[in-house]
Structures are given as structure tokens and as C-alpha cells.
């Protein structure tokens, strides 16, 4: 039954900007960095998880939520003999799927760009395939908790304010706490802090010189489990 709700929610966004955004955001990120071949992969990932992805995720959630909110204010959905709770969960599910798709499109573009630079400029990959996959999975899972929050923000304060609060203030907060002892208690810093260990990239875009501070596998796993639990709650 829940799958039927998700399928119905997905159909609402057929031929809309919401689905275009899944391709546009990763493509723009890759294109912006392709002409700096030496740092293409590192810069692309840094721009993605620090700037473009938070905006993409927040805007996607807001567009998913506003599809029923808008002018009708959920009146069309409320008049149907369906569970409103399941409709909301379907919105969370669809936004999560779009987030995954966008991230793995970015992963593909990052690796394709890396191999193209290897062939054209003979510059080796700075992020390997396994490392890129692990980094992308961490980005997806560690940011899942933002989806219900962004949907709620969009419903309460609208798209513009939701983007300002989550993609703007939230991202800035995450950047400043990611390299401090407060990173664990600030969910916005989870993704940038994980990238220090998984991809070897600091929030300012510089490669990590000292890997001693890198987290262990179990610490990385703990952060991902906490994010999943918080998302499920």
C-alpha cells in the first residue's frame, strides 16, 4: 500500500522542474569544475556537498511539498479517502529517492570527468571508484534526516525561507563546526566531517594533509546509523 502512495506521489512530478533538478544540479556542479582538471574531482565533491547539494535537497523537498500545498493548501488531498499520514510519508520517500538519484548522477559525472581528464591530460584520478561510491553513500545517508525537516519548513514558512534556513544557515553552521569537537552534536556537520575521512577533503576544499585525525570505520558507521535512526523517527 505504501508503494502505491509513493508511485502516486512520483506521478505528480512527471515532466516538472523537480525531476529536471535531479540532472541539472549534478551537471552544473561537474561543469563548473571541469576546466580545472588537476582538482576536478576534489573540487566537484567539495562544491557538491557544501553548496550545490544542500540547495538541491532543500529545493527538491520544497517542490515536493508545495505540489499539494500551493494554492490548494492540501484541500484536494484532504478530500480523498486516503491516509494523510501515508501521503506525508510518501513525500518523504519520493524526496529521498530523488536525492539518491541526484547523488548517483553526480557520482557518475565525477568519475566520467575524472577518466576523461586522465585520457586527455594524463592526470590520474584523485578519488578512486570505491572511494567515490563510499563518499556518495555517506552523503546520502548522513543527510536523510534533513528531508522531513525541509518538508516541514516548506509547509510552515514556504520555499524561500526553507532554502535560506536549511541550505544557507544550516550549511554555514555545518562548515564551521565540522572541524571542531562540536561536530557530533551538530547534524549539519555530519556530511562535511565524514568527507574529511572518506574523501580526504576539508570543508574549505583543501585536501587533508594529516590523516591521523580520520575517523575509524566504526565511527563512520555510528554516524550513519544515528542519521538513519533520526530519519526513521
Label every model-predicted segment.
Residues 26-57, 93-159, 209-218:
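Secretory targeting signals
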Residues 23-26, 91-92, 166-167:
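Residue-level recognition of transmembrane alpha-helices
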Residues 12, 77-79, 154:
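Helix-capping/transition residues at the boundaries of transmembrane alpha-helices
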Residues 39-40, 163, 167-233:
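Terminal transmembrane helical anchor/hairpin motif
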Residues 64-97:
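Helix-loop-helix units of permease transmembrane domains in multi-pass membrane transporters
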Residues 1-23:
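Aromatic- and glycine-rich beta-strand/loop motifs that create alpha-glucan
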Amino acid at each position: 500500500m505504501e508503494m502505491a502512495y509513493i508511485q502516486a506521489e512520483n506521478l505528480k512530478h512527471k515532466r516538472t522542474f523537480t525531476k529536471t533538478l535531479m540532472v541539472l544540479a549534478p551537471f552544473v556542479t561537474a561543469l563548473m569544475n571541469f576546466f580545472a582538471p588537476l582538482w576536478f574531482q576534489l573540487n566537484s565533491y567539495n562544491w557538491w556537498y557544501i553548496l550545490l547539494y544542500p540547495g538541491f535537497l532543500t529545493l527538491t523537498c520544497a517542490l515536493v511539498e508545495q505540489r499539494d500545498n500551493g494554492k490548494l493548501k492540501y484541500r484536494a488531498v484532504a478530500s480523498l479517502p486516503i491516509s494523510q499520514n501515508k501521503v506525508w510519508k510518501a513525500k518523504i520517500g519520493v524526496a529521498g529517492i530523488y536525492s539518491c538519484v541526484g547523488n548517483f548522477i553526480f557520482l557518475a559525472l565525477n568519475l566520467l570527468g575524472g577518466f576523461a581528464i586522465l585520457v586527455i591530460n594524463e592526470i590520474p584520478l584523485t578519488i578512486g571508484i570505491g572511494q567515490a561510491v563510499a563518499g556518495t553513500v555517506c552523503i546520502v545517508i548522513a543527510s536523510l534526516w534533513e528531508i522531513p525537516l525541509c518538508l516541514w519548513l516548506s509547509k510552515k514558512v514556504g520555499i524561500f525561507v526553507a532554502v535560506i534556513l536549511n541550505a544557507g544557515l544550516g550549511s554555514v553552521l555545518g562548515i564551521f563546526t565540522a572541524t571542531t569537537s562540536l561536530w557530533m552534536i551538530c547534524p549539519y556537520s555530519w556530511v562535511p566531517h565524514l568527507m574529511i575521512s572518506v574523501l580526504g577533503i576539508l570543508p574549505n576544499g583543501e585536501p587533508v594533509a594529516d590523516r591521523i585525525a580520520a575517523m575509524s570505520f566504526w565511527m563512520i558507521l555510528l554516524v550513519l546509523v544515528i542519521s538513519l535512526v533520526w530519519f526513521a523517527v
